[in-house]
């Protein structure tokens, strides 16, 4: 079925996945709060990433670095001078746009070219396209543009009681630098030999000019990043390894391979630190968007931090007796983006035999579903016994307890939030200690002893 972004956003708000930020005060543009179901979904996504990329990996360990860092970190990394977006203003609407995204949206929506990439174009090239194509402001419908200029994306604040340049610090625009500055600490304390990786999940902040598309692009976002260090010359081999590993992680969580594609960056599109980058993109209802960037960052970051800090980041290879600065492969995934992708991918509207109304269902992998099961007493008279099952299972799983409205409406409600199993406690359950377990996707029902529920859910929800 063709999926509509407005419908998915409406469901997310209605069912408690995502709410507009600061809603009672009119909101704040492109800020979102995760509701009770959204925080469970996102936490499950992060847990699944950590499980496969850190806990079960023979190579990798994790850290949690500070958001606020010494400003010299950003000077060394190049963010103070180079972390900019091309900005253009419409003089009539007074609205500011990212020039590259303005062009890409036009090429996709008007020209039908979903593969056009403006990244890597010079200011002059972008302005020429805007002028030649007659691209207009979506609000004012005029082409009365300023020149394109640089706009630094870092949020600036001050540490201490005085607001002067000596106390100027920044909210981190990426989690990666916290890993690089801790490279020696981790390598020595954990006695790691190459190749090895350091992973992190954490918030980052970018003062994006044109954030949008729900939680796809926001100024405050969460990243799941791995910096994988290897011997120079082996970086492309390891980049290919992590491309496959990342793709397999997505499909193992039921993401449709038909909605995914790998796109290699052209040479003129590569970041200044990269010699090879591949994006895993997902086909959202609004078009293709980057989920995962898998970049070979060479030795750029460690080399720059060595130059600015005076630290020696060379690795002594015990096998060859060489000393060299390791190369780095970075699989960087946006937690909010991939959560949105799983939400879009899971959404479906299905016809139901014997009913004129379609059912809305979220086909989440059970490991990602906010609730693994819902306990449904057939009558409120049975709630006292049914709640005992909830108490038994909720110590191991996220479980819902729902006793209001008809059993059919409760089934539909659980389908709509992606609960894989509904457990109905009826009057026969009082006698035979069995319950009816309904499968979300097939809608098939089986009778099962209450004593077997924990083992059943453990098997069905494992990842």
From Swiss-Prot:
Which Gene Ontology BP terms does the record give? glycyl-tRNA aminoacylation
| A GO-annotated cellular component | cytoplasm
Residues the entry annotates as binding substrate:
98, 174, 221-225, 330-334
A Pfam family annotated for this chain is tRNA-synt_2b
- What's the EC number here? 6.1.1.14
Q: Which domain of life is it from?
A: Bacteria
Task: Detail which positions bind ATP.
Answer: 206-208, 216-221, 290-291, 334-337
Provide the primary localization: cytoplasm
Where in or outside the cell it occurs: the entry states: Cytoplasm
Q: Which HAMAP family match?
A: Gly_tRNA_synth_B
Indicate what this protein is called per its UniProt record: Glycine--tRNA ligase
């Amino acid at each position: 079925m063709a999926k509509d972004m407005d419908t998915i956003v409406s469901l997310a708000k209605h069912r408690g996945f995502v709410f507009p930020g600061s809603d009672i005060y009119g909101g704040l543009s492109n800020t979102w709060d995760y509701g009770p179901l959204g925080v469970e979904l996102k936490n499950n996504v992060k847990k699944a990433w950590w499980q496969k990329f850190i806990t079960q990996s023979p190579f990798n360990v994790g850290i949690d670095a500070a958001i606020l860092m010494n400003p010299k970190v950003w000077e060394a990394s190049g963010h103070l001078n180079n972390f900019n977006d091309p900005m253009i203003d419409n003089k009539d609407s007074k609205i500011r746009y990212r020039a590259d995204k303005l062009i890409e949206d036009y090429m996709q929506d008007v020209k039908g070219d979903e593969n056009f990439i403006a990244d890597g174009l010079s200011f002059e090239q972008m302005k020429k396209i805007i002028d030649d194509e007659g691209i207009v402001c979506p609000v004012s419908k005029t082409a009365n543009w300023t020149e394109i200029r640089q706009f630094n994306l870092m949020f600036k604040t001050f540490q201490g009681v005085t607001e002067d340049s000596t106390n100027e610090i920044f909210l981190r625009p990426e989690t990666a630098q916290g890993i690089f500055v801790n490279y020696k600490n981790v390598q020595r304390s954990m006695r790691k030999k190459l190749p090895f990786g350091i992973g992190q999940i954490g918030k980052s902040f970018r003062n994006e000019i044109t954030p949008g598309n729900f939680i796809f692009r926001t100024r405050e976002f969460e990243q799941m990043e791995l910096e994988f260090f290897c011997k120079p010359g082996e970086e492309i081999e390891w980049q290919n390894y992590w491309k496959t590993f990342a793709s397999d992680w997505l499909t193992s969580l039921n993401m449709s391979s038909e909605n995914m594609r790998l796109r290699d960056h052209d040479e003129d599109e590569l970041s200044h630190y990269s010699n090879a980058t591949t994006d895993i993109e997902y086909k959202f209802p609004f078009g293709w968007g980057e989920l995962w960037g898998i970049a070979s960052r060479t030795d750029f970051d460690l080399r720059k931090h060595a130059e600015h800090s005076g630290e020696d980041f060379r690795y002594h290879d015990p096998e060859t007796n060489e000393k060299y600065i390791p190369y780095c492969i970075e699989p960087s995934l946006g937690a909010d983006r991939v959560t949105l992708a799983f939400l879009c991918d899971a959404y479906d509207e299905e016809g139901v035999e014997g009913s004129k109304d379609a059912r809305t269902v979220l086909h989440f992998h059970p490991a990602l579903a906010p609730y693994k099961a819902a306990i449904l007493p057939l009558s409120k008279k049975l709630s006292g016994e049914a709640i005992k099952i909830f108490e038994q299972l909720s110590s191991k799983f996220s479980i819902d307890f729902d006793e209001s409205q008809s059993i059919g409406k409760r089934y539909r409600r659980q389908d709509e939030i992606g609960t894989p199993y509904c457990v109905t406690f009826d009057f026969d359950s009082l006698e035979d200690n069995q319950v009816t377990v309904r499968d979300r996707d097939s809608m098939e029902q089986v009778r099962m002893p209450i004593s077997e529920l924990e083992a059943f859910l453990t098997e069905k929800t494992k990842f």
